[in-house]
Amino acid sequence: LGSLNDTVKAVKIDGAEATTDNVANGTYKVARPFNIVTKDGLSDVAKDFVDYIMSAEGQDIIEQNGYIKIDQNAAAYAGSKPEGKIVVAGSSSVSPVMEKLKEAYLAVNTNADIEIQTSDSTTGVTSTQEGICDIGMASRDLKDTETGVTATTIAQDGIAVIVNNENPVENLTSDQV
């Protein structure tokens, strides 16, 4: 939903419109998780950035960018503003909202340096496993074979099923999709 615009038409699925409210309440079922992937031994600054993402401020940024925040009652950010560099790598779907989170975090913690490397979910998970990055980004759940790391869902992304604006189709069933 974060990329939906007026150049295309989103169709209803099982009668439910593709809206953030409908994804959040479960009536629109075409959605995926936006996960960050970490492993044990995260640096203080990386832990603090994760805390920011999961805070009320971070969750509000997620919502302002068209995604569904995970924690409606998240606590305010109360970080210690540690110093250091964080490398975040992975999903090109998660990357745009991660750039916004980075920008907001750097405004409150000028001691941090964050590099975002955009690729795909598998590379994000693998890079985290191998210690190439501190935080991986994945627009899917972890596979059973992706071990030694932990996924934390930071947002839900509603996936709009779209057609050309001139197409008369207004509604599809889950089976049709």
What are these regions (language model features)?
Residues 1-176:
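Exported/periplasmic ABC-transporter solute-binding proteins
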